[in-house]
Amino acid sequence: MELVIISGRSGSGKSVALRALEDVGYYCVDNLPFPLIAELASFLLASDCSAVVSLDIRNFPENLTRIDELLHQLSQLTINTKMIFLDCESATLIRRYSDSRRLHPLSNQDLSLASAIELENTLLDPLRQQADYLIDTTHSSPHELAANLRHILRGSTEKELNIVFESFGFKYGLSADADYVFDVRFLPNPHWHAELRAMTGLEQPVIDFLERQTEVHNFIYQTRNYLETWLPMLEKNNRSYLTIAFGCTGGKHRSVFITEQLAKYFQSRGKNVKIRHRSLEKYHKKT
């Protein structure tokens, strides 16, 4: 359980940082009023969860000694606190604001954009000095910033990919959220064996039947190799979920068995795997 404070110059990537850390499981709060940060820390301590809060010029305390007081208060709570400051060259910030056409938070003080950026830099310097980590985002893409933050906080630059293996029946329609769809209707069908018809791909007689089929083994082997070849690229693509769907006619036998086999294989390789049987859920509701 920890509290991460993200601060830095406006336009340096704080919003990107919050989205990236929310994707890896942190509870994120944007621009929480400064007096409430200690209350949030107490809540986290009681609930045993981790959070990220942004602190910028809009909620910066006028009395700078309050920052020291807050950090001391957090240390008394025995909460693991990290402060990360995002910096960026002024010329790059000017270009980013020109491209986005957004107003700088200090622009309402009758300052030019360049003057507002330099004033903010001066005001934030005490916070920069307190930071545990300083990240210069001048030449960083959003993906590179996200990877840098994951490395600092999780020890790994890669975002954990959640892989969903799901089965479905074509007669109920295609899986709407699937990234990959494999049609297994060409495989031997247990439905045509009266003693197996009422069963599902989770039951041993159906499993035994499908395991005896050479075509089934070949399909599993070749599909497994295909996925193993391209999963590393997908994991580097900064995505949170990958849904791989297998469809047979009714979503009751073949697709269920294939889904289970491949899900268990990748689970045994340390992947974060979930299994979903869409049409099987319909079947159980009917019965």
UniProtKB/Swiss-Prot annotation:
Keyword Glycoprotein part of the UniProt annotation: no
GO MF annotation list: ATP binding; GTP binding
Amino acids binding ATP: 8-15
Gene3D superfamilies: P-loop containing nucleotide triphosphate hydrolases
Pfam families, per database record: PapZ_C, RapZ-like_N
Record InterPro entries: P-loop_NTPase, RapZ-like, RapZ-like_N, RapZ_C
Annotated positions binding GTP: 56-59
UniProt keyword terms in alphabetical order: ATP-binding, GTP-binding, Nucleotide-binding
SUPFAM superfamilies named in the record: P-loop containing nucleoside triphosphate hydrolases
Entry's family note: Belongs to the RapZ-like family.
Name by which UniProt lists this protein: Nucleotide-binding protein HD_0584
